[in-house]
């Protein structure tokens, strides 16, 4: 059958009800269709990209309509064979009922084409709507033939095809131009379903996020300013992208240029000045370690402190003391003219060896401890300054730095012995029996024969009652 051309300005856009009530119903019942615009093609023996060439109605709307005979998967079964040579059609969602004038006339099924074989197929943008006629719409002569044909609408959505798992995944980002045209890497348009207007292809690509890192030296602020305030984003909006593809894209790290860090101009002299200013207020009650910016890459000026056992001494030189500005501060004042003032120290500038026991002291800082430390510490002369020609006055400020070392105590675990319970049995001992017998024997001689017989009878009855009571008590305890 030759292709049919419509006059200019006409488009073939039938509704679901029109496709079923007119075209599909007339095809199954054997009635004549006025204009043959839908061809009969076995869709499950053709690939979807070959279907546009088999359509009788060429159109720029990228939608094609076909009558497809039903191909059963099994001879005795009702399942349809939807596998092609290069892939398969997979149903998505539930079948929707198509109604007309409050009565059901057919069903609509949505299918998506996958390349390869299940379950490792690759989803594509080819979508098919399969319409089937309800059995109530069949003529008596064509009863039971409602499943003989299906009317199919085939169109293509522009989506991002997922790569197989065994292949290397690389996502190319193509930036949209100002006019809002498509990008050539993914063929991504503003809408998932292609409209009547054709889109131009842009051949400009941006660097790949998956394989190439950004060069922070080559990227300036102007490169990133193009994204601010723009209505076009590097990626489509979330509701236009398939969920599966979006999740797979988020699994890859997108490397952005590092932030530019400006080093603050903080010199050693400023640090030492601030430390000296803080010393007057007694800040050195705790250990303070001075950090300099210039010694990060220069290991020559670093101070190495060897800490051994408690008997070893921690020795530092006066030169390093003045550089780091902690433990001790010495001020040397010189004068060319001799004065009558009595200097505190003459001639030699001394350096003290600080014992590590001073740092591991548990005593509270007070003046008595300072005097005791001054009496016990040894002073060794390591460097000598020539004092000929001027007098040297050294003001020495001492600080007692202490460290509190505490130990934690382990918890005690107490084990309790479990002893099984014991059963306690109680037996009632009738004490009144012996008392009454003794009373009876004492008064035997004083009473007559009748009285004695009466007393014996009462005694027997009393004994019998006591025995009965004891018997019932034992039964009660036993049960």
Swiss-Prot record:
Keyword Signal part of the UniProt annotation: no
Keywords for the protein's UniProt record, in alphabetical order: DNA-binding, Nucleus, Transcription, Transcription regulation
Subcellular location: Nucleus
Annotation: DNA-binding region: 105-163
GO terms under biological process: sieve element differentiation; sieve element enucleation
Record bears the keyword Transcription: yes
GO molecular function, one term: transcription cis-regulatory region binding
Chief localization: nucleus
Lineage top rank: taxon: Eukaryota
Tissue: Expressed in a few sieve element cells before enucleation and in phloem-pole pericycle cells.
Protein induction: Regulated by the transcription factor APL (AC Q9SAK5).
Cellular component aspect of the GO annotation: nucleus
Listed InterPro entries: NAC-dom, NAC_dom_sf
Deleted gene: phenotype: No visible phenotype, due to the redundancy with NAC086 (AC Q9FFI5). Nac045 and nac086 double mutants exhibit seedling lethality with defective development of the protophloem sieve element.
Positions of the NAC domain: 6-157
PANTHER family: NAC DOMAIN-CONTAINING PROTEIN 86-LIKE, PROTEIN CUP-SHAPED COTYLEDON 2-RELATED
Function statement: Transcription factor directing sieve element enucleation and cytosol degradation. Not required for formation of lytic vacuoles. Regulates, with NAC086, the transcription of NEN1, NEN2, NEN3, NEN4, RTM1, RTM2, UBP16, PLDZETA, ABCB10 and At1g26450.
Domain notes: The NAC domain includes a DNA binding domain and a dimerization domain.
Protein name listed in UniProt: NAC domain-containing protein 45
Organism in which the protein naturally occurs: Arabidopsis thaliana (Mouse-ear cress)
Lineage: Eukaryota, Viridiplantae, Streptophyta, Embryophyta, Tracheophyta
Annotated gene: NAC045
């Amino acid at each position: 059958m030759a292709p049919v051309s419509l006059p200019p300005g006409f488009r073939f856009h039938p509704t679901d009800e029109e496709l079923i009530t007119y075209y599909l119903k007339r095809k199954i019942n054997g009635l004549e269709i006025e204009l043959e615009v839908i061809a009969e093609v076995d869709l499950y023996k053709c690939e979807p990209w070959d279907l546009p060439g088999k359509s009788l109605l060429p159109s720029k709307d990228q939608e094609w309509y076909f009558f497809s005979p039903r191909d059963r998967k099994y001879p005795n079964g009702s399942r349809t064979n939807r596998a092609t040579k290069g892939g398969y059609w997979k149903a998505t969602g539930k079948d929707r009922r198509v109604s007309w004038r409050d009565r059901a006339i057919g069903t609509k099924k949505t299918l998506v084409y996958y390349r390869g074989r299940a379950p490792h197929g690759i989803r594509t943008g080819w979508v098919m709507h399969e319409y089937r006629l309800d059995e109530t719409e069949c003529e008596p002569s064509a009863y039971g033939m409602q499943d003989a044909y299906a009317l199919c609408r085939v169109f293509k959505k522009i989506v991002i095809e997922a790569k197989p798992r065994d292949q290397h995944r690389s996502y190319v980002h193509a930036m949209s131009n100002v006019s809002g045209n498509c990008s050539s890497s993914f063929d991504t348009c503003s809408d998932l379903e292609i409209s009547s207007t054709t889109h131009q292809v842009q051949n400009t690509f941006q660097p790949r996020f998956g394989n190439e890192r950004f060069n922070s030296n080559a990227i300036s602020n102007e490169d990133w300013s193009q994204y601010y305030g723009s209505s076009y984003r590097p990626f489509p909006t979330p509701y236009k992208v398939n969920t599966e593809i979006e999740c797979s894209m988020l699994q890859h790290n997108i490397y952005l240029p590092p932030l530019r860090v400006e080093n603050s101009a903080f010199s050693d002299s400023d640090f030492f000045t601030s430390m000296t200013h803080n010393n007057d207020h007694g800040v050195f009650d705790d250990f303070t370690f001075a950090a300099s910016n210039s010694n990060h890459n220069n290991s020559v000026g670093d101070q190495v402190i060897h800490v051994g056992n408690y008997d070893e001494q921690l020795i530092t030189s006066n030169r390093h003391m003045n550089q780091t500005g902690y433990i001790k501060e010495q001020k040397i004042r010189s004068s060319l003219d001799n004065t009558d003032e009595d200097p505190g120290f003459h001639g030699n500038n001394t350096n003290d060896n600080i014992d590590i026991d001073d740092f591991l002291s548990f005593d509270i800082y007070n003046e008595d401890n300072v005097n005791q430390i001054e009496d016990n510490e040894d002073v060794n002369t390591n460097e000598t300054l020539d004092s000929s020609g001027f007098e040297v006055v050294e003001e020495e400020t001492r600080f007692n730095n202490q460290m509190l070392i505490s130990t934690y105590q382990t918890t005690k675990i107490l084990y309790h012995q479990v002893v099984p319970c014991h059963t306690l049995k109680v037996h009632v001992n009738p004490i009144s029996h012996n008392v009454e017998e003794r009373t009876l024997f004492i008064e035997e001689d004083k009473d007559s024969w009748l009285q004695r017989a009466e007393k014996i009878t009462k005694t027997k009855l009393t004994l019998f009652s006591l025995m009965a009571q004891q018997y019932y008590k034992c039964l009660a305890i036993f049960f």
